[in-house]
Regions:
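Short glycine/threonine-rich loop-to-helix capping motif typified by GTGT followed
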Residues: 35-41, 73-85, 112-123
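Glycine-rich beta-strand-to-loop/alpha-helix junction loops that act as flexible
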Residues: 28-31, 64-73, 106-109
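Active-site-proximal beta-alpha core segment in soluble small-molecule metabolic enzymes
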Residues: 1-63, 88
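Alpha-helix-loop-beta-strand connector modules within alpha/beta enzyme cores
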Residues: 46, 85-97
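Short, surface-exposed, polar/charged, turn-prone segments marking secondary-structure boundaries
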Residues: 3-11, 52-55, 92-94, 129-133, ...
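Basic, gly/Ser/Thr/Pro-rich low-complexity segments located predominantly at protein N termini
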Residues: 6, 29, 35, 72-74, ...
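Secondary-structure transition/capping motifs at alpha-helix termini
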Residues: 17-20, 52-60, 95-100, 124-131
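Charged (often Lys/Glu-rich) extended helix/loop segments that serve as interaction or gating elements
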Residues: 88, 101-183
Length: 183
């Protein structure tokens, strides 16, 4: 990425490149954002930059591609009020002074619910009274930081054995050689 000073420099020199047409700005700033205050700060900053580019360089951005960083509910206890978040965000966009064509890149907020992660057990072991199941995937296949989110529970179902009662607790671990690869 580039910062606003670099954007200004590029826009100030755009006429030196007759075959280059700069349509707008692409902005991505993070993920798992649930705060309208944070989104407002970002939109205000973007709007102010677009206004400055118009006033200082007579450049009007036709397009703004915005990676919103909207959250995805990865865990059972995650609660996201999507109506409030998206409604508030739409209002913030409507309040912008500059009016580029806006394309939203929704990323994981929309893709996270579009599939399932399947894995299977490749090994099992017991170590000092703790049961471990090793699976053929790991934290490199899903966004789940075992150490950071250790108390959160991902959605889980066991295919083919739903009617058998669970009599033991097992730790499910990925195939990476890391103590943090706990699913």
């Amino acid at each position: 990425g580039i910062n606003s000073d670099e954007i200004e420099e590029i826009i100030s020199k755009r006429n030196a490149f007759e075959y280059l047409d700069i349509l707008g700005i692409q902005f991505f700033s993070g993920t798992q954002k649930t705060s309208l205050k944070k989104l407002k700060r970002e939109i205000d900053k973007l709007d102010n930059l677009l206004i400055l580019l118009k006033e200082k360089y007579d450049y009007t951005a036709e397009e703004l591609e915005y990676g919103t960083g909207f959250p995805a509910a990865y865990f059972k206890e995650d609660t996201i009020n999507e109506d409030e978040l998206i409604g508030g965000f739409a209002q913030l966009l409507n309040e912008m002074t500059s009016k580029p064509k806006i394309t939203l890149e929704l990323g994981r907020s929309i893709a996270a619910i579009c599939g399932k992660y399947y894995t299977h057990i490749v090994d099992k072991k017991c170590n000092k009274g703790e049961n471990y199941l090793l699976v053929d995937g790991g934290m490199n296949h899903i966004v789940y930081y075992g150490q950071h989110m250790a108390m959160k529970q991902p959605y889980l179902s066991v295919c083919g054995k739903e009617t058998e009662p669970c009599t033991e607790s097992w730790n499910i671990c990925g195939s990476l050689c890391s103590m943090n690869d706990i699913i």
